[in-house]
Design a protein with these regions (language model features):
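Active-site or metal-binding loop neighborhoods of secreted/extracellular toxin and effector enzymes
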Residues: 157-190
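Short Gly/Ser/Thr- and charged-rich N-terminal loops/segments
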Residues: 1, 19-27
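Acidic/polar hotspots within intrinsically disordered regions
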Residues: 6-9, 25
């Protein structure tokens, strides 16, 4: 004789319980109403370093960092100019997501200051996950800006590309067109 045990979900749909029992789930029978399935107890520890790198890599092509609005002289202004100047907003947003810094930023200098206060250390050779700061370049009419992004390995980095207005993968030194000024590393990423 085969006993087939079925549960019933909240919408009244029946489902077999046997396979769940074989996988280690517990079943609580409720008279004539339904059965509750409880996941077996597991110890789950988030892998922050790998998740951080995955978020950086998965951010490629994302337009969520394109606009950052502020009131400038009482007027609503997109201070990132539709993604042209979004590098610090992008990098600080990702870092803040993992509590690697204290707050989000709109400038490279304020992001670097927060990184240093938050325990990031200067290193000579980039490690996967390190934050890279590139030298200032002239955007137009004497409008000089530094640049910031993430090192992902194999001489590759991800940063907000001004011409695109969103993060993209590129050569670490933009094919020797931009010098690295500073590399910062967080010991928590080991």
């Amino acid at each position: 004789m085969v006993l087939r045990v079925h549960g019933m979900d909240e919408s009244g749909v029946r489902f077999p319980v046997g396979p769940l029992l074989r996988q280690g789930y517990a079943v609580q029978a409720l008279p004539l109403l339904s059965m509750h399935i409880y996941a077996k107890k597991q110890k789950i520890i988030l892998n922050i370093p790998d998740t951080y790198i995955a978020v950086v890599k998965n951010s490629v092509g994302s337009k969520i960092f394109r606009n950052l609005y502020a009131k400038v002289n009482g007027k609503k202004t997109d201070i990132t100019r539709n993604g042209e100047l979004s590098c610090a907003f992008y990098v600080s947003s990702v870092l803040l997501l993992f509590k690697f810094i204290k707050e989000g930023h709109a400038t490279v200098d304020s992001t670097v200051k927060d990184l240093k206060k938050s325990g990031w250390e200067k290193i000579k050779k980039p490690k996967i996950g390190s934050v890279v700061i590139w030298e200032k370049i002239d955007f137009s009419n004497g409008d000089f800006h530094k640049h910031i992004g993430f090192f992902i390995g194999n001489n590759r980095a991800i940063s907000n590309i001004s011409e695109l207005g969103y993060p993209d993968e590129h050569h670490l030194t933009f094919d020797n067109k931009r010098k690295i000024e500073l590399i910062l590393w967080n010991p928590k990423l080991k």
